[in-house]
Amino acid sequence: CGALAHHIGETNAARNTVRATLLAWGEEIRSGGVDAIVVNASGCGTMVKDYGHLVADDPELADIARQVSAMTRDISELLAELPLETIIDPAPEGRGAVTYHSACSLQHGQKIHDLPISLLRLAGYDVRQPLELHLCCGSAGVYNILQPEMAEGLKRRKLANLEKAGAPIVAAGN
């Protein structure tokens, strides 16, 4: 998707990846064979949804980039539109407790927070949310590589908050 190159400032590499992706997807979209682009990695989803802005100044790619951005959906957005209550058979006693960690790129980049929680509840889970759920876990693309000491502190804080929530399982939209 070009996100990692974009995060480290490799603008040409990112644009080359974005260009190749848009040209390939554009061909498929023009053929009428694409209803949506569904992404299950929130960092890539955020990047692809931003393609329209990233190449807005490129006359060859701007239109298809806007189309791709508009067609791109996080998996939770797609699942929320399906009649899952007719498909999912929740356990009568529930499935237990799960703490939901909302990745920064999902909750801040794509503004998606409640959908994954609703889906987990629909499946029968007792969803718990950690304290400071809005704070970074320390990864942030390549932040953990470029700023390992700062990232380690953020990670420890996030892990402590996840543990305090008390569920044996952590679910993440990434």
Regions found by a protein language model. Name each.
Residues 1-174:
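Iron-sulfur cluster-binding electron-transfer modules in prokaryotic oxidoreductases
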